[in-house]
Regions:
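Conserved active-site alpha-helix within GNAT-family acetyltransferase domains
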Residues: 147, 160-163, 172-189, 196
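Conserved beta-hairpin
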Residues: 59-76
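Conserved acetyl-CoA-binding loop-helix of GNAT-fold acetyltransferases
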Residues: 136, 142-156
Length: 208
């Protein structure tokens, strides 16, 4: 398994991995199901949304991928809360116009994500990073890919770039257990719109 930062040429494949991993994630279904009459429209929306997220972070943040024989099998999307500033213009130039048909779900989903991540993105004196998305392709789940990717690539990248903390939000107790096994502590828990939200944090030894 090899690791590298994604390029713009990878964006559609990366977006597909995110959609495949999140399509049946309970949080997504709880927040978004009522807006879609068919699964095909729901998947189309997720692909477009994830493409904008990925392309914006390739340009301004960090999109790290794990590959096996040239296949993208895991993705980590993250930002330095001190240095990364992704603006509305960045989203627009990354394809946000393609979401115009999906105004209502977007108006619901993005505020939900903002509210969910408030505690994780709380500014401190530390150089905190935020892990916005972390997924393993469904075909590769259950093979310890996520743990290796986190320990061998994600945390070392944060350290090399001068980060001293990495925070994230998750919505399942199973994921909380996974992150705790890799050194994260639960620092906050709440419920938003019927969805459980756990905030996790790990200290990172900065190399800068």
């Amino acid at each position: 398994m090899t690791y590298r930062l994604a390029s713009p040429a990878d964006a559609r494949k990366v977006a597909t991995v995110l959609t495949d991993a999140f399509a049946n994630y309970n949080m997504y279904r709880t927040v978004l199901n009522s807006f879609f009459t068919t699964d095909s429209k729901y998947i189309d929306y997720l692909n477009k949304l994830h493409y904008v997220q990925v392309m914006s972070n390739i340009r301004k943040g960090y999109c790290l991928i794990a590959e096996e024989n040239g296949e993208i099998i895991a993705v980590a999307v993250m930002q330095s809360l001190r240095h990364t500033r992704i603006t509305l213009w960045d989203y627009l130039r990354s394809g946000a116009f393609a979401l115009w048909r999906y105004v209502k779900p977007t108006q619901c989903f993005l505020p939900f994500l903002d509210k969910s991540s408030e505690y994780a993105k709380k500014q401190t004196s530390e150089n905190r990073w935020y892990l916005e998305s972390f997924v393993v392709s469904p075909a590769w789940q259950g093979k310890h890919i996520g743990g290796k990717f986190l320990d061998e690539a994600v945390l070392p990248l944060v350290a090399r770039e001068g980060g001293s903390q990495l925070s994230l939000v998750t919505n399942t107790a199973m994921n909380v257990f996974f992150y705790q096994k890799h050194g994260f502590e639960q620092i906050h828990q709440t419920k938003i719109g019927g969805v459980d939200v756990w905030t996790m944090l790990v200290e990172v030894k900065s190399e800068k």
